[in-house]
Amino acid sequence: NWNNVDLEFRLDCLNEMIGVLKDEKIEYSRLMAFEMGKPVSQAESEIDKCIWLCEYYFENASEFLKDKIINDNAQKYIITIQPLGIILGIMPWNFPFWQVFRFAVPTMIAGNTILLKHAPNVLGCAKAIQQIFEESSLPNNCYNNIIITHDQVSLLIKNKSQPS
C-alpha cells in the first residue's frame, strides 16, 4: 500500500522524476509544440517550472507533512496529514505538464494514489507523464491515466463514492 510507504522512499521517487524531467526536457517541449502548438521556448519554461515544483516538494515535504500542534487557552489540538486514498484529477489542455505536476506531486507525496483524466488533445503528453512516474521507483498503479469522457467521469465519481 502506497499510503504505508515511508516519506523517504516517496522523496527518492520524486528525485528520480526530477532527473527524468531534466534529461527529457527538450523531448517533452517538442511534444507540447507538436500536440498543442505551444512555442518550444514556452514549453521548456513549463518543464522548468515542473522541475522547480518537484525540487520544492523534495526540500519541504518533511516539514509540510509533520504534525502541527495548536494550543489555545482551553485545549491542545494536533493536526495530522493522512492519505485519503485514490484522488481523481481532471486536467485542462493549456499547460499539459504543469497542471498535472502541480496536482500530482503533492498528492503523491502525501501518500495518495492518482487517477488522471487529461484533456483529449494532449494524450501524448499524458502518456509521457505516465512514463515519468513509471520510470521512478513508484510501485505500479500509484499514477494512472484514464481516457474517458466527461460523462464517464460523472459515472466514475458516482460509483466510487458509494460506500461498500
Predicted regions: what they are:
Residues 1-75:
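N-terminal Rossmann-like NAD(P)+-binding subdomain of aldehyde/semialdehyde dehydrogenases
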Residues 66-164:
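Rossmann-like NAD(P) dinucleotide-binding subdomain of oxidoreductase/dehydrogenase enzymes
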